[in-house]
Amino acid sequence: MSDYAKSVHQFKVRLIDGTEKNLADYKNKNLLIVNIASACGFAPQLQELQALREELKDSDFEILAFPSNDFGRQEPLDGMDIQSFCQKNYGVEFPVFEKIMVRGSEAHPLYKFLGDKGLNGKLTSTPRWNFHKYLINKQGEVVDYFFPFTKPSSTKVKKKIQRLG
């Protein structure tokens, strides 16, 4: 069995420009993986996510954003239009990936893994809306999740990230 069997490091995904990215490149970084949507009422959290990234810039931490149209068809944009929206409106500098499905039988394999304890070995939590957040440790293991209404600027989120070291 692979060292990555219970790790997000086993997955390859595509950046918003179509470039393939191996999540093993984020080995030894704590991650916050978030499904985003530009037309969602939670979209202002993009600015909070960027602020969190800046606050933790000297630690081994990164945010990975995955646009999705799964909830309320709230991601009408595609490709670089999503990147442009995130940068122009919220100053986003963290990686934004290609639009994917995050729930159901058509969900991207990464999101199937994130949401299923049988696959990730830790917890079950399928996104119920946009801006569901998964906290991943440096070994690529799912360690916690936060519902959309939990702001990235919250003490709860910050403390959990800091505890990972």
Residue ranges of predicted features:
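Conserved helix-turn-beta segment immediately C-terminal to the redox Cys motif
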Residues: 29-30, 39, 43-67, 87-90
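Thiol-based oxidoreductase modules, predominantly thioredoxin-like and allied folds used
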Residues: 60-77, 93-104
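Extracytoplasmic/secreted proteins, especially bacterial periplasmic and envelope-associated proteins
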Residues: 48-51, 81, 109, 156
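Short, internal strand/loop/helix patches
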Residues: 80-128
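Thiol-/selenol-based redox modules, centered on thioredoxin-like
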Residues: 112, 116-165
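N-terminal "domain-start" segment that seeds a small globular fold
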Residues: 1-24, 42-44, 108-109
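Hydrophobic adenine-recognition pocket in adenosine-nucleotide-binding enzymes
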Residues: 36
